[in-house]
From Swiss-Prot:
InterPro entries: BTB/POZ_dom_prot. The BTB/POZ domain mediates the interaction with some component of ubiquitin ligase complexes. Residues 43-68 are annotated as: Disordered. May act as a substrate-specific adapter of an E3 ubiquitin-protein ligase complex (CUL3-RBX1-BTB) which mediates the ubiquitination and subsequent proteasomal degradation of target proteins. It comes from Arabidopsis thaliana. This is BTB/POZ domain-containing protein At3g50780. It comes from the Eukaryota. Pathway: Protein modification; protein ubiquitination. Residues 127-196 form the BTB domain.
Length: 520
């Protein structure tokens, strides 16, 4: 806090420049022109800059270490204190001593700008508080000792040290003189809540800071009540509020109601809540709302990735995947028997979209390898796929496409056997549905899928690459644009096989190395 000094008024014949000030019936000061006080401050700052030819070097401020206080620990400690009962004693705020030597302050007599403000009935004050800004700007407050002592444990302590009838306190290096004036003025207010309602969140936080420094507990509580009720607009404002609350050191004030807006007493986000959200999204009957919420939840989970998430959340996702797979298999069986074809087609499209979304979630969390194993082993589903009309089945190939894209991007790294089984089981069904995917799915990106398929094939041994690409070549030559274009992968395989056959050279080189090592 700013440094405090006891001053004697009789020793300083200060020339105070009065500004237009109106005193309310409650004793609170206000300027007829709302910007009068700010203009005085600004004009003084500009004059000071012109007059100073070589500004004094300011001492370096010590770096503030970030507080390790957590929201939950503050809530827990605050609730414990409330359970113990109300506090009878008021703790005063200690004024930290100035560690580093400062340049000598300009004398009050030579200051170019001064403002005088009187609280309460004119001529009834019995104390003075002089606020001296860092650049010499001075505000002289005519106040009442009883009001200061009743509301501020800081002023009560300082005034108790003085013996004179008329006390004068000087606060030096005051960073925010305007807020000091407003906070002291709140001591004369009968209804602080009504006064604070006219302010914004940023200004109330500044008042809260000054109120804590002055030990003005009723003002601190009023500020907390205001912050608990008022909306916080934007993440930046929310961060300011929370950081200010966590820095509070005054005991006996309840910060829990404010902090409960952003934190609960639960140690971890409950698994049941996450499961419920996933279930609600997957079971939504309204397509537009379901699509929007899938996008929002995926974005939030992406932001939460690496943060404190329930360890068993992946189990929840895989449980939902299995439920969707069972539903798809049942729908395929019904559709193959000709039962309710239109209803089955719509529901298959919904379940396929759900599986694709769950795969997106797992890929973001780098936990999709198990899904690739499960999908590669869906042989019964792949056999039923051939029996269904294109209109009913092609949505399922979106899941296969998403897996190939993920492998091509390196989002999941299944084993060689899993990659080969995936291509063996689902590549031909994807070829058969490819033309419908291109024209029937707005979100389908053919170039991305083709790149993913090609990269997946090229991760296999050369013999498997040859087998799969020759099979693709026959389909492509017969189907044309209705088949994925894997020409890039075909060129890479060709060069590996015929232009740069590394295998023979490496085999010969390794044999020579082995024989040389044996001779030695």
């Amino acid at each position: 806090m700013a440094e405090i000094k006891n001053a004697k008024v009789e020793q300083r014949q200060t020339k105070i420049r009065n500004v237009p000030v109106a005193v309310t019936p409650e004793g609170f000061w206000c300027c007829p022109s709302p910007v009068a006080f700010q203009k005085t401050l600004k004009s003084h700052n500009s004059l000071t800059k012109h007059k100073q030819s070589s500004p004094a070097l300011q001492p370096p401020k010590p770096e503030k270490k970030p507080s390790s206080t957590t929201i939950r620990s503050v809530i827990a400690s605050d609730e414990t204190q409330q359970n113990l009962g109300s506090f009878d004693t008021v703790h005063s705020i200690a004024v930290p001593a100035t560690v580093q030597e400062r340049p000598q302050r300009q004398k009050v007599e030579t200051l170019p700008r001064k403002v005088a403000i009187e609280f309460g009935e004119p001529g009834s004050s019995d104390a003075k508080v002089i606020l001296v800004g860092k650049q010499g700007f001075c505000v002289k407050l005519s106040v009442h000792k009883k009001v200061l002592v009743d509301h501020s444990c800081f002023f009560a302590k300082k005034l108790a040290e003085k013996d004179s009838v008329f006390a004068c306190l000087e606060i030096e290096s005051c960073e925010d003189a305007e807020l000091y004036v407003e906070t002291i003025g709140l001591m004369y207010c009968k209804d602080m809540k009504q006064r604070l309602m006219k302010q914004n969140v940023s200004r109330v936080l500044r008042v809260l800071k000054v109120a804590e420094l002055l030990g003005f507990s009723s003002c601190i509580q009023s500020c907390l009540d205001y912050l608990e009720a008022v909306p916080w607009v934007g993440e930046e404002e929310e961060e300011k509020v929370i950081s200010s609350i966590l820095r509070l050191k005054t005991e006996g004030v309840g910060v829990t109601p404010v902090l409960k807006r952003v934190a609960s007493n639960a140690v971890d986000p409950p698994k049941e809540t996450l499961s419920r959200i996933i279930e609600l999204v997957l079971r939504s009957k309204e397509e537009k709302s379901r699509r929007e919420m899938k996008s929002i939840v995926l974005k939030l989970l992406r932001e939460q990735n690496g943060a404190n998430v329930a360890d068993n959340f992946n189990d929840t996702i895989y449980s939902s995947c299995q439920t969707c797979l069972d539903s798809v298999l049942s729908l395929f069986k019904q559709a193959s028997e000709g039962e309710k074809p239109e209803t089955d087609t719509k529901q298959i499209a919904v379940e396929a979209d759900n599986l694709t979304w769950l795969l997106d979630v797992l890929a973001e969390r780098q936990a999709a390898e198990e899904f690739s194993v499960t999908w590669a082993n869906q042989k019964e589903l792949a056999l039923l796929h051939e029996k269904l009309p294109l209109m009913s089945r092609y949505h399922i190939s979106r899941v296969t496409s998403r897996l190939f894209i993920g492998i091509g991007r390196g989002e999941l790294l299944p084993s060689k056997d899993t990659r080969l089984l995936l291509l063996t089981t689902w590549l031909q069904p994807l070829f058969n549905d490819y033309n419908w995917l291109q024209h029937g799915c707005r979100s389908f990106d053919g170039k991305l899928v083709e790149e993913g398929i090609g990269r997946t094939i090229l991760t296999l041994p050369l013999e498997d690459q040859q087998s799969i690409l020759l099979s693709w070549l026959g389909s492509f030559l017969n189907g044309g644009d209705g088949c994925p274009n894997l020409q890039r992968a075909f060129e890479v395989w060709w060069r590996r096989s015929f232009i740069r056959p590394y295998s023979d050279r490496q085999a010969n080189g390794s044999c020579q190395t082995d024989s040389t090592s044996k001779e030695e």
